[in-house]
């Protein structure tokens, strides 16, 4: 069984959430892989390229996935077409990814992104301002906004999330009995409840 953690947008393998999960897995003697999803080229990041990377890493092997924000959306997309994935843990999954970009940037900034080809964002993993190409948005629109996976899943989402509204996870869980939603008094980062999430999620994954 392979275990993979998929980090969020403009994040990386050294994020606090990724490292908390890795420590918990290490304590159980289990390897948790945490790939750098942009493969060193954040500027040309796309959903399709990240899915291809996951496919290359897993190579059809049985797997269980953890995904945070954009990584949660990736995990859901991948699981929807790969039955060898048999369990998922999603942290504030960024369902309806392209529409969230429209809402966050607003029409003027989105138009400028389209016209110039570039958008500047703060990269939390590198602690710098980085550019990302409009291909990210165009490519995201090609993918299902709410991936219809049927594997057992635990979803953890903060009720005060202003980046990815909890309503997206509520709607998904309401239409997917395989997905159990835990609502938490937290924001998008979920850092104040991270220990409890790890404590609940890891036993579910390694059982």
What are these regions (language model features)?
Residues 1-39:
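Short, surface-exposed "cap/lid" segments of acyl-processing enzymes
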Residues 15-22, 48, 166-170:
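Short, surface-exposed alpha-helical segments at coil->helix boundaries
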Residues 25, 78-82:
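Aromatic pocket-lining residues of Rossmann-like dinucleotide-binding sites
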Residues 34-40, 93, 186:
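Active-site loop/turn elements of alpha/beta-hydrolase fold enzymes
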Residues 35-58:
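Catalytic nucleophile-loop/oxyanion-hole region of alpha/beta-hydrolase
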Residues 66-75:
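Gly/Ala-rich beta-loop-alpha elbow adjacent to hydrolase catalytic centers
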Residues 85-87, 91-175, 179-207:
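The alpha/beta-hydrolase serine catalytic core
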């Amino acid at each position: 069984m392979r275990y993979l953690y998929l980090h969020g947008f403009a994040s990386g393998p050294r994020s606090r959430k990724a490292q908390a999960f890795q420590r918990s897995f290490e304590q159980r003697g289990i390897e948790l892989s945490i790939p750098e999803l942009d493969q060193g080229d954040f500027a040309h990041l796309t959903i399709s390229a990240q899915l291809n990377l996951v496919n290359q890493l897993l190579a059809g092997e049985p797997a269980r996935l953890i995904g945070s924000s954009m990584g949660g959306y990736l995990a859901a997309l991948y699981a929807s077409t790969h039955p060898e994935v048999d369990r998922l843990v999603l942290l504030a999954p960024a369902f309806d990814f392209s529409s969230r970009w429209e809402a966050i940037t607003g029409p003027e900034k989105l138009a400028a992104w389209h016209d110039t080809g570039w958008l500047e964002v703060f990269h939390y993993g590198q602690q710098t301002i980085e550019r990302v190409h409009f291909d990210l948005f165009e490519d995201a629109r090609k993918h299902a906004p709410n991936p219809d996976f049927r594997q057992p899943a635990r979803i953890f989402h903060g009720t005060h999330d202003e980046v990815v509204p909890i309503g997206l996870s509520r709607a998904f869980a309401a239409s997917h009995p395989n997905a159990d939603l835990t609502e938490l008094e937290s924001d998008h980062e979920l850092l104040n409840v991270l220990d409890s999430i790890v404590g609940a999620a890891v036993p579910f994954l390694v059982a």
